[in-house]
Amino acid sequence: MCSLAAGNGRGAELGPEPLELSDSGDDAGWEDEDADTEPAHGRQHTPCLFCDRLFASAEETFSHCKLEHQFNIDSMVHKHGLEFYGYIKLINFIRLKNPTVEYMNSIYNPVPWEKDEYLKPVLEDDLLLQFDVEDLYEPVSTPFSYPNGLSESASVVEKLKHMEARALSAEAALARAREDLQKMKQFAQDFVMNVDVRTCSSTTTIADLQEDEDGVYFSSYGHYGIHEEMLKDKVRTESYRDFIYQNPHIFKDKVVLDVGCGTGILSMFAAKVGAKKVIAVDQSEILYQAMDIIRLNKLEDTIVLIKGKIEEVSLPVEKVDVIISEWMGYFLLFESMLDSVLYAKSKYLAKGGSVYPDICTISLVAVSDVSKHADRIAFWDDVYGFNMSCMKKAVIPEAVVEVVDHKTLISDPCDIKHIDCHTTSISDLEFSSDFTLRTTKTAMCTAVAGYFDIYFEKNCHNRVVFSTGPQSTKTHWKQTVFLLEKPFPVKAGEALKGKITVHKNKKDPRSLIVTLTLNSSTQTYSLQ
């Protein structure tokens, strides 16, 4: 799943450097310690960086390294200015290359663990990789331990060490001040975005959009490419086909409304199983191709095509028996097309009629993908030798739509929204929800992913369900990923409590603003 991947352990070659990489410890002493290194049943232990002793925590391991091997992780982190990813690389470098303590203490910049290959864990569930390196960034009160042979310059070295400690402390204080300033900016941004949303009329935003405001949305569906992608999505298209073909009683001799018909595929499915009349509505230019498609398949006597927004057109009937639509967007609600379906339901659906799909859920799941997080976030720390870390503040607030590797999941999913299309209203589509993610792996939590499930249930003799989750067959909806600014360690069995708020963006009501609170940290994301 998403636990830290196992590696080849100790004893690997360091590389071309002519260095002695065996530990200077006494082998004979190890056998005497074996009796003390057996882990208690059911407890997680991790080995020392320089010998075979096992410990139950990172703190115990580092204390042992300092006392027995003269390796001070505090000094090492401060000496090289290591943050989250640098620390991860350091630990994996030592695990993989098995260098001596003397070699590690002799290293100056550039360090040998800069490559991204050292982001890959060597030991599964390594407790040292779950240690919060920021805990080490307190004012430095003890000098660094430098190699022997510099005693003749001791006074100069001491002064330099104290100057370096003061510089590091000042740099850390400046970083904290910048972070506080950014939090203030983020708070102001979140406040403005949420006020915008709360003050808008969510029951009419989509219906009230003018042609010049909504033209880009509909023009994007005028090109064949997006329809080709959707039609080739077998999970999507075959689920609709199976629902209609396996439940013909729902459509036979009924009047059907297809909202956002596109190429007309759902309308043709309905016509094939005996619908009396199908009214297909779409505002995009693809409707003209749909007209040709309907004629080619000799269904023009059953299917009536109407170009325009469902909120603006006049239908040739007062009421319909069935409404069908493929309205789902990323994270289910992106594009706000469900608003149009609900509008059609309230205006045109006959008493006792049905809307399909009828049930939808949105779920969240925790993700651990340190390498991908580094690629997206740590990348900006050094771009061809230049510091572009300020770009992180622009990258993190944008939700990412991508396929999540199911092996990176570290929790059970949690439903945050249940929608019954027969009873829900447009105002229900903006919501807040508390959630709890039960972790299944010990790892670093780097992101939260969202997805949705779709159900065709009402009056069905053969129920049809499909999921867009990471553990199901890939769909064109993929998953929506909310990257965490600061990953944090979790242990298997933990209950991660959080809160999510989903609103339309007032300036663009087809896009979403998502505010996520997790691990005492709040971040607002845009999906647009």
Swiss-Prot record:
Cellular component terms per the entry's GO annotation: cytosol; nucleus
Alphabetical list of Gene3D superfamilies matching this protein: Hnrnp arginine n-methyltransferase1 (2.70.160.11), Vaccinia Virus protein VP39 (3.40.50.150)
Residues where Phosphoserine is found: S22, S24, S169
GO BP term, example: positive regulation of osteoblast differentiation
Molecular-function GO terms, alphabetical: histone H4R3 methyltransferase activity; protein-arginine N-methyltransferase activity; protein-arginine omega-N asymmetric methyltransferase activity; protein-arginine omega-N monomethyltransferase activity; zinc ion binding
Residue stretches of biased makeup (Acidic residues): 23-37
Domain SAM-dependent MTase PRMT-type: 214-528
Annotated region (Mediates interaction with ALDH1A1), positions in chain: 184-528
Primary location: cytoplasm
Catalytic activity: L-arginyl-[protein] + S-adenosyl-L-methionine = N(omega)-methyl-L-arginyl-[protein] + S-adenosyl-L-homocysteine + H(+); L-arginyl-[protein] + 2 S-adenosyl-L-methionine = N(omega),N(omega)-dimethyl-L-arginyl-[protein] + 2 S-adenosyl-L-homocysteine + 2 H(+)
Record-listed E.C. numbers: 2.1.1.319
Cell membrane keyword on record: no
Changes seen on gene knockout: shRNA-mediated knockdown leads to elevated osteoclast numbers and osteopenia.
Active site, renumbered: E326, E335
Keywords for the protein's UniProt record, in alphabetical order: Acetylation, Cytoplasm, Metal-binding, Methyltransferase, Nucleus, Phosphoprotein, S-adenosyl-L-methionine, Transferase, Zinc, Zinc-finger
Pfam families in the cross-refs: ANM3_C2H2_Zf, ANM3_zf-C2H2, PrmA, PRMT_C
First and last residues of each zinc finger (C2H2-type): 46-69
Modified residues (N-acetylcysteine): C2
Complexes and interactors: Monomer and homodimer. Interacts with EPB41L3 (via FERM domain); the interaction is direct and inhibits the protein-arginine N-methyltransferase activity of PRMT3. Interacts with the 40S ribosomal protein RPS2. Interacts with ALDH1A1; the interaction is direct, inhibits ALDH1A1 aldehyde dehydrogenase activity and is independent of the methyltransferase activity of PRMT3.
Function: Protein-arginine N-methyltransferase that catalyzes both the monomethylation and asymmetric dimethylation of the guanidino nitrogens of arginine residues in target proteins, and therefore falls into the group of type I methyltransferases. Catalyzes the asymmetric arginine dimethylation at multiple sites in the Arg/Gly-rich region of small ribosomal subunit protein uS5/RPS2. Also appears to methylate other ribosomal proteins. May regulate retinoic acid synthesis and signaling by inhibiting ALDH1A1 retinal dehydrogenase activity.
PANTHER family per record: PROTEIN ARGININE N-METHYLTRANSFERASE (PTHR11006), PROTEIN ARGININE N-METHYLTRANSFERASE 3 (PTHR11006:SF53)
Name the record gives this protein: Protein arginine N-methyltransferase 3
Source organism of the structure: Mus musculus (Mouse)
Gene name per UniProt: Prmt3
